[in-house]
A protein has these predicted regions:
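Active-site-proximal catalytic alpha-helix in oxidoreductases
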Residues: 2-27, 31-44
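NAD(P)-dependent Rossmann-like dehydrogenase/reductase catalytic/cofactor-binding core
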Residues: 37, 41-129
Length: 129
């Protein structure tokens, strides 16, 4: 449960950004790519507030501002946005599995409603997508 929810904390912001650029990840801006990582961090914090155990070393620290893991994650997001790997790993799935992403979005919204965690990057990406 922890691994799956922590994984989806990263997948959904990627999907939102993908929808915002009609599946063309190479069109994402620096700000959108930064918000993907910010939104994943916000979501890990929300999961913890909802009582979901989150392995900080494997998840939260990867997205926390100022960490070495964050820099690596930002580089990975850039690389995925600029190569065919991102198309295969993110765009193709997000664009073909819209109902699955909607289900995950609704499930995370319901979980989030049980917390008071502010998620500004998440909300902005979600609205754009």
């Amino acid at each position: 449960d922890e691994w799956l929810k922590s994984h989806i904390a990263f997948i959904l912001p990627c999907a939102y950004a993908c929808y915002a650029v009609d599946g063309e990840l190479s069109r994402t801006t620096v700000e959108q790519r930064r918000m993907i990582v910010d939104a994943a961090w916000e979501c890990c914090e929300m999961l913890k507030a909802a009582g979901v155990p989150v392995n900080d070393a494997e998840n939260t620290d990867r997205y926390r501002e100022g960490t070495k893991q964050r820099k690596k994650t930002e580089r990975m997001v850039y690389w995925m946005a600029q190569t065919v790997v991102g198309k295969w790993c993110i765009s193709d799935h997000a664009m073909r599995a819209v109902s699955e992403m909607q289900y995950l979005d609704e499930a995370f919204a319901a979980l989030r409603a049980t917390t008071l965690v502010e998620m500004t990057a998440w909300d902005e990406l979600r609205r754009a997508g």
